[in-house]
């Protein structure tokens, strides 16, 4: 989605500058890649100091709830050039907590800066306000709330190309990236597999590297990493996703298998929860809700067992396909975006030096 936000923002800025409308806008990629030509629907000045443009999201083939999502972007001059770009979350754009800042990835901000700043006149700053008219209603069909994102959709893309996490083509792309990473002369034998955009953003903030973003095809990627000679692999993801691995589910798309609360309830039995507590877990609305129903000490014990079980089941999974020296570690984050639970291997191989 950030690509279409950037294209609409550029069209609006051009309108504000008095330039004629162009149906395709050049979006500059932060990594220096070939600029993208991204279509926009319309653009117009609203007054002497602000303009509006509209684009429509095209996520490519596959299922995506943002397909044909209309994106409005209003731009306006700011009083001071020192402010640079000022991002204002409009209606339908997710915020970090009620009244908080817009939820956007580093990539999304860099995309806007690379695309817009070269067009700004000297001494001029710009306010950018994306608006997603259907964002609030569509957000109810996502896991945004589980990460503390409220009021709309998060702008958390990390690349211009759309990835379909459940498609075979996505698996092939990840495997190509894995092979390239391992073939790099500077590769040191370890890699962090991150699940989803939130995981990727959090891993970067934690200073973990090298990183490889994966979708739902975790099993084949683990085996491929072992075959490629990776020695230490860290799985980093939201507890509601990685818990499936603790249940032996290694293709994690929700259309294929779930079982999250059942797995958590079984683990609760292992840590000695009472029958009443187990019933509360089984009746919870989500994994996050289940942990919230426990006292902090019990929740910590259960989370640590969950992380350890993810490590154990993942190790057992690759052992079915060969005898490799790969060590698999796991760290899980919760809705507060905190790396909350680490398995024993994660503590030993990835976090000892950081701590």
UniProtKB/Swiss-Prot annotation:
Q: Which UniProt keywords apply?
A: Cobalamin biosynthesis, Methyltransferase, S-adenosyl-L-methionine, Transferase
Question: Looking at the keywords, is Cell membrane present?
Answer: no
- Specify whether Oxidoreductase is a keyword of the entry: no
Q: Which reaction does it catalyse?
A: Co-precorrin-5B + S-adenosyl-L-methionine = Co-precorrin-6A + S-adenosyl-L-homocysteine
InterPro entries linked to this entry: CbiD, CbiD_sf
What are the BP-aspect GO terms? anaerobic cobalamin biosynthetic process; methylation
Q: Which pathway is it part of?
A: Cofactor biosynthesis; adenosylcobalamin biosynthesis; cob(II)yrinate a,c-diamide from sirohydrochlorin (anaerobic route): step 6/10
Q: What is its EC number?
A: 2.1.1.195
SUPFAM superfamilies in the record:
CbiD-like
Q: Which GO terms describe its molecular function?
A: cobalt-precorrin-5B C1-methyltransferase activity
Q: List the disulfide bonds.
A: none
Broad EC category: transferase
Family that this chain belongs to: Belongs to the CbiD family.
Name of the protein described by the UniProt record: Cobalt-precorrin-5B C(1)-methyltransferase
Q: Which organism is it from?
A: Parasynechococcus marenigrum (strain WH8102)
Query: Which gene is annotated as encoding this protein in its UniProt record?
Result: cbiD
